[in-house]
Amino acid sequence: MKIALDAMGGDYAPIETVKGALEAIKESNISVVLVGKEEEIKKILQDYHYNESKIEIVHAEEVIEMHEHPAFAVKEKEDSSIVKAIKLLKEKKVDGVVSAGNTGAVMSSALLYLGRIRGIKRPAISTLIPTLTQIPSIILDIGANVDCKKEYLEQFALMGKVYMEEIFNVKNPKIALLNIGEEEGKGNQLVQETYTLLKNNPLFNFIGNVEGKDLFKGTANVIVCDGFVGNVAIKTAEGVAETLFDLLSSEIKSSLWSIILGLLLKPKFKNVKKKLDYSEFGGAPLLGVDGTVIISHGRSKAKAIKNALKVAEKMVKLEVNKKILEGLNKITDRGD
């Protein structure tokens, strides 16, 4: 199996992306196609011993930067690492794509060249969030669709359900709507209409609404919302987590006794940090496009890239997109 990696995507590319690819080929049976500036990639590879038969390079002269407008950049920079990686998937030269680059550009490129799974109205950007249980939850959408219809959210629920069943082996995952209250009548018109739709769908183990405070409790395995709400929720959570760790670090250094206490608690802090670390999950899928595309955090280092490549491998092996289509057909058969 071959996975294309956008070697130029992310804050620490190409050094960390290349290192992540090398770690991945050691731990799995995949081959990695590094897409990016060939000379830069070769220079990094010179410092490592690796199985050369499992690494290929496809040169891409251009890079879509994080600040660039996604749709314009994809059309203007056809020789960019993101676009060329997606084109390799379209041409069936690879089985999946991983990128830590401009999320919007990855999505725009995937829609332009791969299209949607038949019947999917809108793809969704998802992310995995740590919980108090041993299994993360998936939240979608987190930015692809600011304005949604109830049918879009129903499909997001389906895609999240299939992903949790196949990738994390969660049987009959609990599905919830992110809302301003737990009661059925809460929320705007979209949320209330979607509530009724999910409640009456026999395919779903729908548990109702969850509030923002419940996101990390593991109350639901799949959390559904529109892209505006999802993006605000995730960015807020990231900011709170970073601020808390900064405050703790500052307090620990404030006196000798707190330094000693901090040293004693260091292993516990490490465990907590590991549970909150996005690199453990690697990346999250762009669900609904007709191909396996994994989007990693822009700050991904080698470990996150390695794990993202493994997620892509698993998605391909388990035929997640095929199962999404099968689930979609069941919804359609109900006459919705």
From Swiss-Prot:
InterPro entries for the chain: FA_synthesis, Phospholipid_synth_PlsX-like
**EC number in record:** 2.3.1.274
Question: Which GO MF term does the entry hold, naming one?
Answer: phosphate:acyl-[acyl carrier protein] acyltransferase activity
Cellular location(s): Cytoplasm
Segment forming the signal sequence? none
Q: Which UniProt keywords apply?
A: Cytoplasm, Lipid biosynthesis, Lipid metabolism, Phospholipid biosynthesis, Phospholipid metabolism, Transferase
Enumerate the catalysed reactions: a fatty acyl-[ACP] + phosphate = an acyl phosphate + holo-[ACP]
Cellular component per GO?
cytoplasm
What's this protein's family per the entry? Belongs to the PlsX family.
NCBIfam families (alphabetical): plsX
Its biological function?
Answer: Catalyzes the reversible formation of acyl-phosphate (acyl-PO(4)) from acyl-[acyl-carrier-protein] (acyl-ACP). This enzyme utilizes acyl-ACP as fatty acyl donor, but not acyl-CoA.
Q: What is this protein called?
A: Phosphate acyltransferase
Q: Which source organism? A: Dictyoglomus turgidum (strain DSM 6724 / Z-1310)
UniProt lineage: Bacteria, Pseudomonadati, Dictyoglomota, Dictyoglomia, Dictyoglomales
